[in-house]
Amino acid sequence: MCAARRRELALIFRGTFVHSTWTCPMEVLRDHLLGVSDSGKIVFLEESSQQEKLAKEWCFKPCEIRELSHHEFFMPGLVDTHIHAPQYAFAGSNVDLPLLDWLNKYTFPTEKRFQSTDVAEEVYTRVVRRTLKNGTTTACYFGTIHTDSSLILAEITDKFGQRAFVGKVCMDLNNTVPEYKETTEESVKETERFVSEMLQKNYSRVKPIVTPRFSLSCTETLMSELGNIAKTHDLYIQSHISENREEIEAVKSLYPGYKNYTDVYDKNNLLTNKTVMAHGCYLSEEELNVFSERGASIAHCPNSNLSLSSGLLNVLDVLKHKVKIGLGTDVAGGYSYSMLDAIRRAVMVSNVLLINKVNEKSLTLKEVFRLATLGGSQALGLDREIGNFEVGKDFDALLINPRASDSPIDLFCGDFVGDISEAVIQKFLYLGDDRNIEEVYVGGKQVVPFSSSV
C-alpha cells in the first residue's frame, strides 16, 4: 500500500501558503505542508506538526520535502477573466480615444491583420509567454474573426501549459471598418468549425468559448444562433456589456424593441450561468437582478475602464446583488497585461467611489486578492478545480520571492516576525512584478521558468 500511495505523490512543499476562501478573503497559512499528486491535485495541506503522520500515510522522507525560505510564499495562480490576445500587439499604446472610436481607429485594423497565421503565431506566442510569466495561470481569451488564427491561439496556450478559454470572435455588423466582418452565415459556420476542431483536439485545459463581440457588431440572428451553439455543446459564452455611455445609447438605437442592454443578450439565448460579460459599468438594478437570476458573471476590467474613460464599476454593488465577478486585464484597452495591475486598479476604483460618496466603504486589498483568484475561478465556472489550495483542487500556483534578484521590493527587519508577515504579502501585491514570480505551476506542472521545448 505504501508503494502505491507513494507513486501518487509528485511534489511536497513546506512553508507559507496564502489563499482565499469564501469566508476569509486572505488566509495566511504559515509553516504548512502541501502535497501534490502526480495528476496535479492537492492531496494534503496541513500544519507541519502533522509531518510524521503525513509521512506515514504518504510514504515520503524528510529529504523529499522542498522547504521554502522564510520570505517566500505560494499563492494561487491569477485568473484573467477578460483579455484580447490579438490586441497585445499594441498593448501599452493607443489609449487616447473613447471606446467606439478606439475600436474603429486601432482595434479593428489590428485584428484584421490576423488573417495571416504568421502574424497570429508571433503575437499569440508572445502574449501567452508574457501573461504566464506574470502569473496568469488561467486566461479567458478573445481571438479574432479568423478561425485558423484562433485555433493557433488555442494550440499555443496548450503548448505552454496555460489554462484557458479561447474564443473565435463573431461579428456580422461593422459599417466603419466593413472589411473586418463576416456574413451571418459565415460567422455561424466558422464558429461551428472552431468549436468542432477545438473539441476534437481534446486539450486537457484549453476550452472553446462562444464569443459574440458585442451587441453592436452582431445581428439578432447571429446572437440567437450563437446562443444555440453554446447550448448544444454546453459551452461558456463571453462578450461585452455596458462599457460606456455612448455604446449603451447606440445599443438602444440599434435594438429599440428591448428593455435594456442585458435584455438584448437575454432574449437571444446569450445570458446563462455559463456567461461572462466584461465591464458592466452602468448596469441597472433590474439588470443586475437578471444577471443574478441567470447565474451570469461579470469581468471587472478597471485599467481599461479608466484608460478609455469608460466608467467606474461598483463592485460592492455587484456583490450585493450576488453576481459572480472576477478581474480582467482587458488588453489592450487596459494597457497592462499584468493581473497585479488589475488588483491595484480595482482597489483604486473602489477608493474613488468612496471619495465620491457612492459607497460608504471601499474594497480591501484582501477582498480584491480574492477576486483575482477564487472570484475569477468562480466567474469562469472553475471554482471546483482551481482558485485556492483546497484539497482536491488542481495545484495552480505562483511561488513568490520578494527578495528575488533585482526585486522592485525592499524588505526590512520589521517585515518579519519569525515567518512572513502580511506586510510582505501586501508589498508584493502593490509593488511586485514578474521578477518576484519565480515559478508558475498549472495543474501541478511547472510551466515557468519555461522549458526548452516552448
From Swiss-Prot:
**Residues where substrate binds:** 84-87, 213-214, 240-243, 330
Q: Where would one find the signal peptide in this protein? A: none
**Any one Gene Ontology molecular-function term assigned to this protein's record:** zinc ion binding
| Record PTM Phosphoserine, positions in chain | 453
**Gene3D superfamilies xrefs:** Metal-dependent hydrolases, Urease, subunit C, domain 1
Question: InterPro entries attached here?
Answer: Amidohydro-rel (IPR006680), Guanine_deaminase (IPR014311), Metal-dep_hydrolase_composite (IPR011059), Metal_Hydrolase (IPR032466), Metallo-dep_hydrolases (IPR051607)
Pfam families linked: Amidohydro_1
Reaction(s) catalysed (UniProt annotation) = guanine + H2O + H(+) = xanthine + NH4(+)
Which top EC class applies here? hydrolase
Cofactor note as given: Binds 1 zinc ion per subunit.
Q: Which CDD domains match?
A: GDEase
Cofactor(s) the record lists: Zn(2+)
- Binding annotation for Zn(2+): 82, 84, 240, 330
| Tagged with keyword Glycoprotein | no
Q: Which domain of life is it from?
A: Eukaryota
Q: What is its EC number?
A: 3.5.4.3
Subunit structure, as described in the record: Homodimer.
What this protein is reported to do is described as: Catalyzes the hydrolytic deamination of guanine, producing xanthine and ammonia.
Q: Which family, according to UniProt?
A: Belongs to the metallo-dependent hydrolases superfamily. ATZ/TRZ family.
What this protein is called in its record is: Guanine deaminase
Q: What is the lineage of its organism?
A: Eukaryota, Metazoa, Chordata, Craniata, Vertebrata
Gene that this sequence comes from: Gda
